[in-house]
UniProtKB/Swiss-Prot annotation:
Statement: the UniProt record of this protein carries the keyword Metal-binding: no
Disease: Corneal dystrophy and perceptive deafness: An ocular disease characterized by the association of corneal clouding with progressive perceptive hearing loss. Corneal endothelial dystrophy: A congenital corneal dystrophy characterized by thickening and opacification of the cornea, altered morphology of the endothelium, and secretion of an abnormal collagenous layer at the Descemet membrane.
Transmembrane segments: 359-381, 395-408, 414-430, 444-467, 476-496, 556-577, 591-612, 641-658, 684-704, 735-759, 766-783, 788-810, 816-832, 837-857
Protein name in UniProt: Solute carrier family 4 member 11
Residues in the Extracellular compartment per record: 382-394, 431-443, 497-555, 613-640, 705-734, 784-787, 833-836
Organism: Homo sapiens
Reported induction: Up-regulated upon oxidative stress, as it occurs in cells exposed to tert-butyl hydroperoxide.
């Protein structure tokens, strides 16, 4: 059986698409002309009892193109002889046309369509049907019962048949293929991505007297085939074929499809409860679309669409004149963020879209994610500084710095934390003070003051613009370096536990104690004879095999510590991924995922503290400070020592500058859909002010933490799922940009000072090490460097269809990966060196990656391939 089938794709470029990629498909992003397609009307007269088939869509590659899919199929029956010879094969003819989004500002018909249809549109909320047939039948019955829809000559069965096209042999059963649909699709350099949560179906019929619209919202996402795996909304547009060009079914469908193409708008519709709220959301969306002056709605557009949204990356490298206006960036940041400051406290608390539950779970997550590393690094600083900076001071500094940043920062989603590189720097300062007989508190304070001075200069001269030179590949190297430091800290801590308990040190202490007891007994009197003395020696100096209890205790401690660490990692990561599982209710899955870290920490802390009481576990050291807020005597240092501190402060400022801006850039990434703007320069100045106070009082420094800040954004995000090639992908709809979560977490961290030493000492060190592994593992998601390293271990047939694999020769990919690994090893060699003075210059190695990327790598790999591999990948 043969069939003449036509499938029409309407393409529409994104609003921010400069030019198309060099792949030969398109050369620019201007609008393309299209012809009106009216041939589908003739099918009404030839409908019969045909079967149906499915068709696969074509893949279109290009940069930042969004297009609609309009499927229109026509059937011509053939004889059974052709069917027998063809073996049931059908022919599918595919063509593409461009369909622009409706411009609500310029096209008056868009307003009239929406206002007219809202008065009589049929809205079906919470539809429980699972099949497409049942959903459409429910919508048609609702349409027929509506008194405003007077269509006496309309045959619902014929109308139902008009919605589908048969494309198969009758004896093989019916597989429905919709005749005419519109579906939102975005095509970028990384491939094609369908908006699978909505589907607009078009039908024309001569018996209809006027146009009608029916919208159905499904209770649960339904899988209706390829590229329609998560459908929540169905828009049905019915119209007679003979209409003015501005009133056709296609124009009406284009109006509603334009509105539903906004992911934030679809989320609002999911939150409505009544038909009136549903229609109010439609009117509100029309008003937002009207306020947009040029082109379609940007993906970030939300309720406050008039907010100026600075770009995540500057399209061109900064010029010298960009750094000249003193304090210009700070003034612009304050002007951008200050008008929205009250909303940072009221969003999610006041209004319709409340998110109190999400705020509570996110606050608990941040509390544990900040407190436990603070305890771990505080314990490390206590060992490295001989108690000058201990756990108590580290918790106090974390609470104070976090509170100030949560209250006054321009981007409160960024989380400040003391980190492993800072602990390395503090250790270097202690070594220098011991070598040159300097007062640690004074030298530490001067180093921090110089660091803050340089950070303030960077902020006033707008040096954050330099971060636009950091490519994705450079960011991935630094991010992976941070993850490696977490893993290394966990491994080193576990090795220390095994060295202390599993191997000979525990027994050495045991023998020492027994020997001292023997000496004391031998001095009791000379009346003991030689045989008794020999017996005592033999008893107390027994071999290790004769001390089963002692040996068992030490080995049990080491093995249990390893199991506790791995168990914390396993439980935390399993719960973190639990929201992707099919078990339990979606709300329960989301809560378990948000509270994964607290649950894992509390569970294994209780297991180690109460389940194995007889086994000694390694705990962090706590020595309460008599005066934790004593100010350093900065005047006691000589001018030469102050000058030396300036050099250390400059190198430290490089680390702060890179970490702060890099993490802030990851938080403000376009895929996170933040709407309140950025404040790179002001946040850098605020960071300098905060660390000035911490330096004077001998508290540990803090800066933006990775991956805590991106995880904070993720915890506050509403996501929409889509299914492609059997994999579930999440797209962020919006993020609750609030100060309450980081503010609450900082308050809880400060109150934790009251929990020292008990019950915080119930948290053993292996749980802290498990936390480090959890943070390192979760930070690897989406890291292309890790994915490309994994390609070396896979056979070529198992390579994923990513954009760089399709567009870059395989050898070039491996060359680029190898060069990245070499840079990572160089960074690790300096940052993790056993020589203290080598650790000081690893921030310069980070800066050196900029000329390596722009000067050295293009000499080895073509620039066009480098640009592809540095592009964002969205599956």
């Amino acid at each position: 059986m043969a069939a003449a089938t036509r499938r029409v794709f309407h393409l529409q470029p994104c609003e921010n698409s400069p030019t198309m990629s060099q792949n030969g498909y398109f050369e620019d992003s201007s609008y393309y002309k299209c012809d009106t397609d009216d041939t589908f009307e003739a099918r009404e007269e030839i409908l019969g009892d045909e079967a149906f088939d499915t068709a696969n869509s074509s893949i279109v590659s290009g940069e930042s193109i969004r297009f609609f899919v309009n499927v229109n199929l026509e059937m011509q029956a053939t004889n059974t002889e052709n069917e027998a010879t063809s073996g049931g094969c059908v022919l599918l003819h595919t063509s593409r046309k461009y369909l622009k989004l409706k411009n609500f500002k310029e096209e008056i018909r868009a307003h009239r369509d929406l206002d007219g249809f809202l008065a009589q549109a049929s809205i079906v909320l919470n539809e429980t049907a699972t099949s497409l047939d049942n959903v459409l039948r429910t919508m048609l019955r609702r349409f027929a019962r509506d008194p405003d829809n007077n269509e006496p000559n309309c045959n619902l069965d014929l109308l139902m048949a008009m919605l589908f096209t048969d494309a198969g042999a009758p004896m093989r059963g019916k597989v429905h293929l919709l005749s005419d649909t519109i579906q939102g699709v975005t095509a970028t350099v990384t491939g094609v991505r369908y908006q699978q949560s909505w589907l607009c179906i078009i039908c024309t019929m001569k018996a209809l007297q006027k146009r009608h619209v029916c919208i159905s919202r499904l209770v649960r996402p339904q899988n209706w085939g390829e590229n329609s795996c998560e459908v929540r909304f169905v828009i049905l547009v019915l119209a007679p074929p003979k209409m003015k060009s501005t009133k056709t079914a296609m124009e009406v469908a284009r109006t509603f499809a334009t509105m539903f193409s906004d992911i934030a708008f679809r989320q609002k519709l999911l939150e409505t409860r009544t038909e009136e709220e549903f229609k109010e959301a439609l009117v509100h969306q029309r008003q937002l679309l009207t306020m947009v002056s040029h082109g379609p709605v940007a993906p970030r557009t939300k309720e406050r669409s008039t907010v100026s949204l600075p770009a995540h990356r500057h399209p061109e490298p900064p010029k010298c004149k960009d750094f000249v206006p003193f304090g210009k960036g700070i003034r612009e940041d304050i002007a951008r963020r200050f008008p929205l400051y009250p909303l940072d406290f009221t969003d999610g608390i006041i209004g319709k879209n409340k998110a109190v539950g999400k705020y509570i779970t996110t606050t608990l997550f941040l509390y544990f994610a900040c407190l436990l590393p603070t305890i771990a690094f505080g314990s490390l600083n206590d060992e490295n500084t001989d108690g000058a900076i201990d756990v108590q001071k580290t918790i106090a500094g974390q609470s104070i710095g976090g509170l100030l940043y949560a209250l006054f920062s321009g981007q409160p989603l960024v989380i400040l934390l003391t980190t492993a590189p800072l602990a390395l720097y503090i250790q270097v300062i202690r070594v220098i003070c011991d070598d040159y007989d300097l007062d640690f508190n004074s030298f530490y304070a001067w180093t921090g003051l110089w660091n803050s001075f340089f950070l303030a200069l960077y902020a006033f001269f707008n040096l954050s613009l330099v971060m636009s030179l950091f490519k994705r590949s450079t960011e991935e190297i630094i991010a992976l370096f941070i993850s490696i430091t977490f893993v290394l800290d966990a491994v080193k801590g576990t090795v220390k536990i095994f060295w202390k308990y599993y191997y000979g040190h525990y027994l050495d202490d045991y023998h020492t104690k027994r020997t001292s007891s023997l000496v004391s007994l031998s001095g009791l009197g000379a009346s003991l004879n030689a045989s008794l003395h020999t017996a005592l020696n033999a008893s107390f100096l027994a071999s290790p095999t004769e001390l089963p209890s002692a040996t068992h205790s030490g080995q049990a401690t080491a093995v249990l510590s390893l199991l506790i660490m791995l168990g914390t990692l396993w439980l935390g990561y399993t719960l973190y991924q639990f929201k992707k599982s099919p078990y339990l209710h979606p709300c329960v899955r989301e809560i378990l995922s948000d509270c994964a870290l607290p649950i894992a920490v509390l569970a294994f802390s209780l297991i180690s503290s109460h389940g194995f009481r007889e086994i000694e576990m390694s705990k962090f050291r706590y020595n309460p400070s008599e005066s934790p807020f004593a100010m350093a005597q900065i005047q006691s240092l000589s001018l030469r020592a102050v000058s030396g501190a300036m050099g250390l402060g400059f190198l430290l400022s490089m680390l702060f500058f890179i970490e702060q801006n890099l993490v802030a850039a990851l938080v403000n990434a376009p895929e996170n859909r933040l709407v309140k703007g950025t404040a790179y320069h002001w946040d850098l100045l605020l960071l300098a002010i905060i660390n000035t106070g911490l330096s004077l009082f001998g508290l540990p420094w803090i800066h933006a933490a990775y991956p805590h800040s991106p995880l904070h954004v993720r915890a506050l995000a509403l996501v929409e799922e889509r299914v492609e090639n059997g994999h579930i992908y999440d797209t962020i709809v919006n993020v609750k940009e609030t100060r309450l979560t980081s503010l609450g977490a900082s308050v809880l961290v400060g109150l934790s000072l009251l929990l020292l030493p008990v019950p915080l000492q119930w948290i053993p060190k292996p749980v802290l090490y498990g936390l480090f592994l959890y943070i390192a593992l979760t930070s690897l998601d989406g890291n292309q460097l890790v994915q490309r390293v994994a390609l070396l271990l896979k056979e070529q047939t198992a390579y994923p269809p990513t954009h760089y694999i399709r567009r870059v020769p395989q050898r070039k990919i491996h060359y680029f990966t190898g060069l990245q690994v070499l840079q990572l090893l160089l960074l690790c060699a300096f940052g993790m060196s056993s020589l203290p003075y080598m650790k000081m210059i690893f921030p310069l190695i980070m800066i050196a990656m900029i000329p390596i990327r722009y000067i050295l790598l293009p000499r080895i790999i073509e620039a066009k391939y480098l640009d592809v591999m540095d592009a964002e990948h969205r599956p």
